Swiss-Prot record:
Pfam families: TP_methylase (PF00590). It is found in: Cytoplasm. It comes from Helicobacter pylori (strain J99 / ATCC 700824) (Campylobacter pylori J99). It is an enzyme of class 2 (transferase). Transmembrane segments: none annotated. This is Ribosomal RNA small subunit methyltransferase I. The keyword Hydrolase does not apply. One of its GO terms (molecular function) is rRNA (cytosine-2'-O-)-methyltransferase activity. One of its GO terms (cellular component) is cytoplasm. Its main location: cytoplasm. Belongs to the methyltransferase superfamily. RsmI family. Catalyzes the 2'-O-methylation of the ribose of cytidine 1402 (C1402) in 16S rRNA. Its EC number is 2.1.1.198.
Length: 289
């Protein structure tokens, strides 16, 4: 039997009883990082309440196998479905497997080979941040992690805002972001969604948990003077009516080289990138003249 287990996103007390029961009886662990999973089991075993009810939570005769985005396909190509006749747990470093973490390819494998599996509910930053945002909408769009590079990130934001333009009601967008790119992402969001409100959550469930709410520019100002180390969740409220053409017009106003702008415009409009490139060059030449 294959189990997808939620792990605490910061507070060890958020582990569930069902997860503890499965952890105690599993023989094999497929882990995003084996070191992190072993440490989690060690910490759980040190808790007197947990160790009393689950004395074998950190039994030594376990097999820990790395399973992450860099090796998942190779791993699945090498094993036989009979491998899953054992009791096997799938664990990410924190939160729910398959939710911006390894696991989805394994679910697909289980479905393809008619394997039994179970997904246990539990802690995750996505729903925790949305519920903490105070935005009244009962739905949200999950965008996961944005691209690392600014031009790809801006294009992704434009596409998301364009998609939301066709919805009748407000739909908050939830992003995950690292501290290394947080301020850059906020600058891009402010350029493309200026005036919109944002809820930013730092280090959810941890000792230094912090909430910020306001217009994007206000949060940028606050965070430029703050310690931003830690994991972040951003919830953007598209409270203004966005016209479908907004994405293209916003793109054309960006201070980008003509070649990059042409490629991004081509991706949005299905036009020829080379023709658009020469068109942008002519426009810039006219402006200079």
């Amino acid at each position: 039997m294959l189990y997808f287990l939620p792990t605490p996103i910061g507070n060890l007390a958020d582990i569930t009883l069902r997860t503890l029961e499965v952890l105690e009886r599993c023989e094999v662990f497929l882990c995003e990082d084996t070191r992190v999973s072993k440490r989690l089991l060690h910490l759980l075993a040190k808790n007197p309440i947990i160790s009393h009810s689950f004395p074998n939570i950190a039994a030594k005769k376990r097999e820990f196998i790395a399973f992450h985005s860099h090796n998942d396909q190779e791993f699945l190509n090498q094993i036989e479905p009979s491998f899953f006749d054992k009791e096997i747990a799938v664990m990410s470093d924190a939160g729910m497997p398959s939710l911006s973490d390894p696991g989805m390819s394994l679910v697909a494998y289980a479905l393809k080979h008619n394997l039994q599996y179970d997904v246990l509910p539990g802690a995750n930053a996505l729903t925790t941040a949305f519920c903490a945002s105070g935005f009244l909408e009962g739905r949200f769009f999950y965008a996961g992690f944005l691209p690392h590079k600014s031009k790809e990130r801006r294009l992704r934001i434009i596409k998301i805002l364009n998609a939301l333009a066709y919805l009748e009601e407000k739909t908050p967008v939830v992003f995950y972001e690292s501290p290394h790119r947080l301020l850059e992402t906020l600058r891009d969001l402010n350029d493309l969604a200026q005036g919109m409100h944002l809820f930013a959550a730092k280090e959810l469930t941890k000792l230094h948990q912090q909430y910020y709410l306001g217009e994007i520019s206000q949060i940028m100002t606050q965070l430029q003077k703050s310690n931003i180390q830690g994991e972040w969740v951003l919830v953007l409220l598209n409270e203004k009516k966005i016209e479908p053409s907004m994405g293209l017009s916003a793109l054309l106003e960006l201070d980008l080289p003509p070649k990059i702008k042409a490629k991004m415009e081509a991706a949005m409009t299905q036009k020829n990138a080379k023709e658009l490139y020469f068109q942008r060059l002519l426009e810039e030449k006219k402006q200079c003249d």
